[in-house]
Amino acid sequence: FSHVLGQIDDENNGISGIEKSYDYELKTRKKPLELTVDTDIQFLIREELLKFQTIFNSTGSAAILMNVNSGNIISIVSIPDFNLNKRQQIKDSKFFNRATKGVYELGSVFKTFTLAAAINEKVVEPNTSFENLPKSIMCAGRSIREYDDEIPENLTAEEILIRSGNIGSVRIAQKIGIENFKNFLKKIGVLNKIQFDIDEIGQPISFRWGKCKLATSSYGHGITTTPLQLAKGYAIITNGGYDVKPTLIKKKLKNNKNKILS
């Protein structure tokens, strides 16, 4: 919970996390501020991250579990984390919240956005056939290859996603077009800095769109976002196209009527 709760200074003022964002409320309100995070699930997910961090010898990891309809965050973990009771032993890198502030090229998880955008723009259906897909293509003198040479050359759009095909994803993105794909990603919050309950929020790195950028973005390379924005984007696609605002604070649930995808 260290990144969620945040830190206070020597004068008991919040300087990060919920402690900073809700500093006044925490000092003045009579009732406690209730979070959406489930402590048991938070513990289990943290343990899994630590286990796989050891297996893969990674420097850090993050995970978010969110209700796709309400936006309530059930678990949000960033590793490494820290113990505020042992401040002198904390390295600065442990303060960094990878789940909300870390900006990454997230790779193949973007292929879901590519297919969703194509379906939303009505240029592709799940059973649309793509034939004679090569194992590699050239763009501006650089090669884009399939990660798996066993991927068949004839696939439907749905099968491209299932098999995680790079070239197939590029072909789908080409049907969408640069402006439509860019606008779709902005609409679902993947390319825009989003409002959240804590201030530690990352900003996707801006870039210039072009044919090659469209191609690589279709499979999640050359385009960045945060895990929190990824969760928001997936939630919108999963819940039927309704906008959702990720939150850590329990509120009275309201029906989500802002449909942003067709």
Question: Which residues does each PLM region occupy?
Answer:
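Envelope-exposed proteins and targeting segments
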Residues: F1-H3, R29-L33, T59-A62, P126, ...
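Small/polar-residue-rich segments within soluble enzyme cores
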Residues: F1-K31, L35
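Non-catalytic surface loops within mature trypsin-like serine protease
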Residues: I8-D10, T39, D81
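Short N-terminal helix-initiation segments at or just after the protein's N-terminus
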Residues: N12-N13, N57-S58, E105-G107
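Conserved, well-ordered alpha-helix/loop/beta-strand core segments that scaffold catalytic motifs
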Residues: E25-S61
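Beta-lactam-recognizing serine transpeptidase/beta-lactamase-like catalytic domain environment
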Residues: A63, N67-S108, F113-S262
